[in-house]
Amino acid sequence: MFSLSSLSSSGGHSEQKERERISYFDIRINSPYKDIILIQGSPLELSSIPLSGNLVISVKNEIVVKKISLRLVGRFKLEFLQVGRYKKNSSSLASLVKEKRKIFECYWDNLLVSSKGDVLVGGENAENQHNSSSGRSTSNQDMDTSGNAIFLSKRSLSSPVFNKIIRRKTHSSHRKILELPENGVTGTPFEGLRENARSRSSSSNTLNNNSHSYSNRDGSGSSYLFLMKRGNYELPFNTMLPPEVCETIEGLQSGSILYSFEAIIDGRQLWDTDLSVHTSPHGPIGSTSTSGNGMRTKNKIIIKKFKYLRILRTLSMDNLAMQEEISVGNTWRDKLQYETSIPSRAVPIGSTTPVKIKIFPFEKNIRLDRIEMALIQYYAMKDSSAQIYDDEIAVMKITHLADFGPLTDKLDVDCPFTIPDNLKQITQDCCLQDNLIRVMHKLQVRILLQRQVDGEYKNLEIKAQLPMLLFISPHLPMKGRLVLFDKHDGKIHFRPGELVPLFLTTYPAQGLTPGVELNSTTTAHLALPQPPPNYHESTNDHLMPALQPLGADSVVLTVPSYEQAQAQASASSYVTGSVPAYCDDD
């Protein structure tokens, strides 16, 4: 007996079939940094952001596929334990806050037909498209009064009638087959093929965002199958991300925004009697069609690949925060005056910023004990009901001990502070999608002094808070969390205690089966953007000696005096060999 769940299964030996047919399967992003999209500037400074790449497949044995789809999903997650206290008895009450929703989705229905992706969630017109397509799909189903939807609603899903319908539709779904070229292909092999059928299929199923394959009402989706022969395939994909797309947030313990790709090869197993095909001379290049009623399929072969994508944002070069110096100072009457400063409010993650402290004592017997600095990270998150949860933690603390003796004059102290270089320990400053997640930082400085009064030392404490804007810079070494995927449902897991370097420019050559050459799948190594050289290191602008006059390579000219100029003018009037003037005889 058939059941409803058996229709969506991927076959009894899907993993074995996957190893037999596909030797390499990967998603590659066109970016100078591996699996990272780096956006420079704020959403107000940018237009749409291009995203492109290639789906790389190395086919070991021939495989028949219905389509090769790709999906990019961004998910917002809240999960933490909120603890509240009563004032009367100081008892605590804990409640679990948990929420997970999709904030971005882009879908490529079939990369064999089109490389352009459709933004379904998170785009400018995604919500309107979703509502309109949902209305169309609902109306089409209601109008089909003689179809299977209304008929099956009156029957039990486990009834023999239902199983008979399933068996008949499974065995009678005939399609034509298109054969791809030998040794693989680079590009979209059947660009624009049945584009109308593809658009109807994707629009009528926009409601079901959790399904892994879109299809028409008859369950076929398209009337074509594709035969992929042994070889290497590069299928391009591209789309435009909205400028306000949220950044990846992976370091906060209570909330996150994570992006992941999911590529699916929707394979089919053919009946033995339908394995022979013949070439169609009038079809597209490399296409074949079957005789009779076409190809018949019986089982699905689903092959999945997941890829973690980081979308990070950095500051533009003309951001005012880079040139803004932060200084905090105050005066204690009859005691001292102090000033604490950092050269720039914008500090890249993984760098070291100098903290300058100046103390002007107004009386004797004051000495500096130590300087304590702490980097405070404030973060706030908002759930679907607009409830805001905020907290702050000390990301890093350092202490500088000092023994300068009694302060008798101005004291200048330079205390370098190093920002952590991994995105698990610290999160960049951000304000995402109507305060969905907001992160800010400040540097807290405590100056501990001792003042001698009547032979005893009393403690003096100076507190200063310097606002900082922490941003991501690709020019500094940085680390992120190691991501692992559940091979069945694509759930993201972070391996505790392990980090991976970011902003790598090369792809590892792992996963390639020996004997299978990938001729066109090598990703170009793009050079990192370098800052301009210092002036004394310039090679195009040649420096001139300070005492060398302008035009040093030209002949030195001397200016004659007035008498010399008059003598030269009178001598030139008696030059011999000159042509006489014309005179008229009349």
Swiss-Prot record:
Signal peptide: none annotated. Residues 126-145 have a biased composition (Polar residues). The keyword Ubl conjugation applies. One of its GO terms (cellular component) is cytoplasm. It holds the Pfam family Arrestin_C. One of its GO terms (biological process) is ubiquitin-dependent endocytosis. Keywords: Endocytosis, Isopeptide bond, Ubl conjugation. InterPro entries: Arrestin-like_C, Arrestin_C-like, Arrestin_domain-protein. There is a cross-link at K364 (Glycyl lysine isopeptide (Lys-Gly) (interchain with G-Cter in ubiquitin)). The keyword Ubl conjugation applies. Residues 199-216 have a biased composition (Low complexity). Ubiquitinated by RSP5. Residues 123-145, 182-217 are annotated as: Disordered. GO terms for molecular function: protein-macromolecule adaptor activity; ubiquitin protein ligase binding. Transmembrane segments: none annotated. May regulate endocytosis by recruiting RSP5 ubiquitin ligase activity to specific plasma membrane proteins in response to extracellular stimuli. Belongs to the arrestin family. Interacts with RSP5. Present with 1970 molecules/cell in log phase SD medium. This is Arrestin-related trafficking adapter 5.
